[in-house]
Amino acid sequence: LEAAALTATYVTAPEARGPREGLARYDETTTTTTTTTRGGATRATGRRRLVAVVAGDSTACGVGCGDDGRGRTRGETAAGEAGPTLARAFARGLGERMTADVEWRALGFKGADVRGLRDKLIPALREATEGAGGRGDDDDDASERDGRGRRASVDAVVIMCGLNDLKHSIVGRRSETFRTELRELVREVRDVVGDECVVVLPATPLEAATLFPPPLAWVATRMNDLWDEQKAHVSRLFAHNVLFVSKPSLDAMRERAAKHTGRVAESISLICGDGIHPNDDGYDAWARHIADECVPSLERALAAQK
């Protein structure tokens, strides 16, 4: 009953403003990346540009970005003006680890469960691959197209999902249904991007949420773990290039945020004012954790293509 009441009264934070695509440029002199919108000046580095898509539910479209954690939107925030933090930070983290420029796209659908993502994401992903710039050498746009007029393939697709499916458990939907739908979604994604693309299924660190009072918080966390176990199960159904990423601990996320912001870890809030979605710091820490975990798989996938 308490869960049903929260579902009925919950008000979500708004989506991030700004672009849904951009470019994280790797700076060899500082070993860091800077994020820009696509279409800026290019560099003839001879280095392959990577392409990453962060797709899925409200976390992919940046719900909570620009919120200071107390329900107030900051006047000038990078996430508020530059698009979803999760996709941008994932591209930055990937670029720093892979020493490469990373083109990013965010394909988020607020409120979507996995069944909804099968209807909405696949057409959007197919359209996005028409404009993905992956295998060029950072020359002009025309040189990045292949002989069919298409851009080259996407290197990584991160699928954010689970929380909206978890809400369906209130009305009796089982975790096995989520697993079946997710398996089909992954297959459909791979039909679009190819088996050489790394598909990433991250677990959700729901422990950071402040929305749920005890004992509901303990129940919600355990249920979330059960849904995350289905992601791990799905990843094992595929021979290669489907990766489950376990969730980071709260301490690890705060340490990452402290390193990024220069603030004391214990003082950092990771959740926006709606009590469940990450704020900018939370998204950044989570995204960099995902990036770190998927680098070995991505390196193997790229090596296999040579």
Residue ranges of predicted features:
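N-terminal secretory targeting modules
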Residues: 1-54, 60-67, 297-298, 302-306
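Conserved SGNH/GDSL esterase-like catalytic core that processes O-acyl groups on lipids
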Residues: 49-53, 59-180
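A structural motif corresponding to the C-terminal end of an alpha-helix
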Residues: 97-98, 185-200, 230-245
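Alpha/beta-hydrolase-fold catalytic nucleophile elbow
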Residues: 160, 202-203
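Short "lid" loop at the C-terminus of a central beta-strand within the Rossmann-like core
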Residues: 164, 205-208
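Substrate-gating cap/lid alpha-helix
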Residues: 209-246
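Short, flexible, mixed-charge acidic loops at enzyme active sites
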Residues: 254-268
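Histidine-centered active-site loop/cap adjacent to the catalytic His
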Residues: 267-306
